[in-house]
Design a protein with these regions (language model features):
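Conserved S-adenosyl-L-methionine
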Residues: 32
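Class I SAM-dependent transferase core
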Residues: 1-24, 29, 61-64
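C-terminal substrate-binding/active-site "lid" region of AdoMet-derived donor-dependent transferases
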Residues: 110, 114-163
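S-adenosyl-L-methionine
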Residues: 54-89, 93
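A short, conserved alpha-helix within the catalytic core of class I
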Residues: 101-109
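Conserved SAM-binding loop of SAM-dependent methyltransferases across substrates and taxa
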Residues: 35-46
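Core SAM-dependent methyltransferase catalytic element
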Residues: 157-177
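Conserved SAM-binding motif I beta-strand of class I
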Residues: 48-53
Length: 177
Protein backbone atom coordinates (compact mmCIF):
# COMPACT_ATOMS: atom_id res chain seq x y z
CA UNK A 1 0.00 0.00 0.00
CA UNK A 2 1.36 3.40 -1.01
CA UNK A 3 2.05 5.75 1.93
CA UNK A 4 -0.58 8.42 2.55
CA UNK A 5 1.94 11.27 2.65
CA UNK A 6 2.76 12.90 -0.67
CA UNK A 7 5.78 11.80 -2.65
CA UNK A 8 8.55 14.26 -3.50
CA UNK A 9 7.74 15.91 -6.83
CA UNK A 10 10.18 15.13 -9.64
CA UNK A 11 11.13 18.80 -10.02
CA UNK A 12 11.84 19.14 -6.30
CA UNK A 13 13.78 15.85 -6.35
CA UNK A 14 16.06 17.21 -9.08
CA UNK A 15 16.98 20.23 -6.94
CA UNK A 16 17.38 18.06 -3.82
CA UNK A 17 19.85 15.76 -5.59
CA UNK A 18 21.84 18.71 -6.94
CA UNK A 19 22.03 20.36 -3.51
CA UNK A 20 23.05 17.09 -1.82
CA UNK A 21 26.08 16.73 -4.12
CA UNK A 22 26.18 12.98 -3.48
CA UNK A 23 29.59 11.33 -3.58
CA UNK A 24 30.53 7.87 -4.87
CA UNK A 25 31.49 5.64 -1.98
CA UNK A 26 29.47 7.68 0.50
CA UNK A 27 26.60 6.86 2.80
CA UNK A 28 23.31 8.71 2.33
CA UNK A 29 20.39 8.82 4.80
CA UNK A 30 16.81 9.41 3.65
CA UNK A 31 15.01 10.25 6.88
CA UNK A 32 11.25 9.96 6.57
CA UNK A 33 11.69 7.97 3.34
CA UNK A 34 7.96 7.52 2.69
CA UNK A 35 7.61 5.98 -0.77
CA UNK A 36 11.37 5.55 -1.14
CA UNK A 37 11.54 7.85 -4.16
CA UNK A 38 14.50 9.89 -2.89
CA UNK A 39 16.36 6.76 -1.72
CA UNK A 40 15.93 5.10 -5.10
CA UNK A 41 17.04 8.24 -6.97
CA UNK A 42 20.13 8.58 -4.76
CA UNK A 43 21.14 4.90 -4.78
CA UNK A 44 23.17 4.94 -8.04
CA UNK A 45 25.36 7.77 -6.74
CA UNK A 46 26.42 6.38 -3.34
CA UNK A 47 27.74 3.19 -1.78
CA UNK A 48 24.88 2.76 0.69
CA UNK A 49 21.50 4.34 1.45
CA UNK A 50 19.72 4.26 4.81
CA UNK A 51 15.99 4.53 4.05
CA UNK A 52 14.46 5.40 7.42
CA UNK A 53 10.80 5.67 8.36
CA UNK A 54 8.82 5.05 11.53
CA UNK A 55 5.82 3.71 9.60
CA UNK A 56 5.99 -0.01 8.72
CA UNK A 57 3.73 0.49 5.70
CA UNK A 58 6.14 3.09 4.28
CA UNK A 59 9.13 0.80 4.76
CA UNK A 60 7.26 -2.08 3.07
CA UNK A 61 6.22 0.08 0.12
CA UNK A 62 9.68 1.65 -0.27
CA UNK A 63 11.30 -1.80 -0.16
CA UNK A 64 8.91 -3.00 -2.89
CA UNK A 65 9.64 0.06 -5.06
CA UNK A 66 13.40 -0.33 -4.60
CA UNK A 67 13.19 -3.98 -5.62
CA UNK A 68 11.26 -3.06 -8.75
CA UNK A 69 13.88 -0.40 -9.56
CA UNK A 70 16.78 -2.81 -8.98
CA UNK A 71 18.24 -0.65 -6.20
CA UNK A 72 20.22 -3.16 -4.14
CA UNK A 73 22.29 -0.83 -1.93
CA UNK A 74 19.38 0.47 0.17
CA UNK A 75 19.14 -0.63 3.81
CA UNK A 76 15.61 -0.16 5.16
CA UNK A 77 15.41 0.90 8.80
CA UNK A 78 12.08 1.07 10.59
CA UNK A 79 12.18 3.43 13.56
CA UNK A 80 12.60 6.98 14.78
CA UNK A 81 15.44 9.25 13.84
CA UNK A 82 17.85 10.21 15.18
CA UNK A 83 18.03 7.16 17.50
CA UNK A 84 17.83 4.64 14.67
CA UNK A 85 21.22 5.93 13.44
CA UNK A 86 23.00 5.13 16.71
CA UNK A 87 25.84 2.66 16.23
CA UNK A 88 25.81 2.95 12.43
CA UNK A 89 28.44 4.63 10.27
CA UNK A 90 27.49 8.30 9.97
CA UNK A 91 25.93 9.38 6.69
CA UNK A 92 27.92 11.92 4.69
CA UNK A 93 24.74 13.31 3.16
CA UNK A 94 21.15 13.33 4.40
CA UNK A 95 17.68 14.24 3.19
CA UNK A 96 15.08 14.91 5.85
CA UNK A 97 11.59 14.54 4.43
CA UNK A 98 9.70 14.22 7.70
CA UNK A 99 9.22 16.89 10.34
CA UNK A 100 9.10 14.69 13.45
CA UNK A 101 11.97 15.48 15.87
CA UNK A 102 13.42 17.85 13.25
CA UNK A 103 15.70 19.79 15.61
CA UNK A 104 17.07 16.62 17.23
CA UNK A 105 17.63 15.01 13.83
CA UNK A 106 19.50 18.04 12.47
CA UNK A 107 21.61 18.31 15.64
CA UNK A 108 22.47 14.59 15.61
CA UNK A 109 23.50 14.69 11.95
CA UNK A 110 25.62 17.79 12.55
CA UNK A 111 27.28 16.15 15.57
CA UNK A 112 28.31 13.11 13.50
CA UNK A 113 29.85 15.24 10.75
CA UNK A 114 27.22 14.92 8.04
CA UNK A 115 28.69 17.24 5.42
CA UNK A 116 25.44 18.25 3.77
CA UNK A 117 21.79 17.91 4.66
CA UNK A 118 18.65 19.02 2.87
CA UNK A 119 15.38 19.41 4.76
CA UNK A 120 12.14 19.44 2.79
CA UNK A 121 9.35 21.46 4.42
CA UNK A 122 5.75 22.02 3.44
CA UNK A 123 4.78 23.68 6.73
CA UNK A 124 6.07 27.12 7.63
CA UNK A 125 6.65 26.00 11.22
CA UNK A 126 8.99 23.24 10.03
CA UNK A 127 10.84 25.74 7.85
CA UNK A 128 11.34 28.08 10.81
CA UNK A 129 12.49 25.29 13.10
CA UNK A 130 14.95 23.88 10.55
CA UNK A 131 16.46 27.29 9.78
CA UNK A 132 16.74 28.32 13.44
CA UNK A 133 18.29 24.97 14.43
CA UNK A 134 20.86 25.14 11.64
CA UNK A 135 21.68 28.77 12.46
CA UNK A 136 22.15 27.89 16.14
CA UNK A 137 24.52 25.08 15.12
CA UNK A 138 26.38 27.30 12.65
CA UNK A 139 25.61 25.06 9.67
CA UNK A 140 22.87 26.98 7.84
CA UNK A 141 23.75 27.52 4.17
CA UNK A 142 20.57 28.57 2.32
CA UNK A 143 16.82 28.15 1.95
CA UNK A 144 14.90 27.76 -1.28
CA UNK A 145 11.23 28.01 -2.13
CA UNK A 146 10.19 25.80 -5.03
CA UNK A 147 6.75 26.03 -6.55
CA UNK A 148 5.85 24.02 -9.62
CA UNK A 149 2.91 24.87 -11.85
CA UNK A 150 1.66 22.30 -14.35
CA UNK A 151 -0.09 23.01 -17.63
CA UNK A 152 -3.72 21.99 -18.09
CA UNK A 153 -6.06 22.34 -21.02
CA UNK A 154 -8.69 25.02 -20.66
CA UNK A 155 -11.21 26.06 -23.31
CA UNK A 156 -8.96 25.08 -26.19
CA UNK A 157 -5.93 26.75 -24.62
CA UNK A 158 -3.49 26.11 -21.85
CA UNK A 159 -3.41 27.36 -18.29
CA UNK A 160 -1.08 26.65 -15.40
CA UNK A 161 -2.28 25.26 -12.09
CA UNK A 162 0.19 25.91 -9.26
CA UNK A 163 1.10 23.25 -6.75
CA UNK A 164 1.83 23.93 -3.11
CA UNK A 165 5.24 25.46 -2.41
CA UNK A 166 8.02 23.32 -0.99
CA UNK A 167 10.78 24.87 1.10
CA UNK A 168 14.25 23.35 1.09
CA UNK A 169 16.68 24.18 3.88
CA UNK A 170 20.29 23.30 3.14
CA UNK A 171 22.89 22.97 5.84
CA UNK A 172 26.13 21.31 6.80
CA UNK A 173 29.85 21.92 6.80
CA UNK A 174 30.23 21.66 3.02
CA UNK A 175 29.52 24.90 1.12
CA UNK A 176 26.54 24.95 -1.25
CA UNK A 177 26.98 24.85 -4.98
Amino acid sequence: MKPTAGSTADEVLAVVLQKLALRPGGIFADIGCGSGKVSIAAAPFVREVYAIDRRPESIAYAREQAGAAGAVNIRFLEGEAPGILDGRPAPERAFIGGSRNISAVIAALAATGTGRMVVSCVRIETLGEAVSTMRRLGIFRESLLIQVARSHDLAGGTMFVPGNPVYLVIGGEDPCS
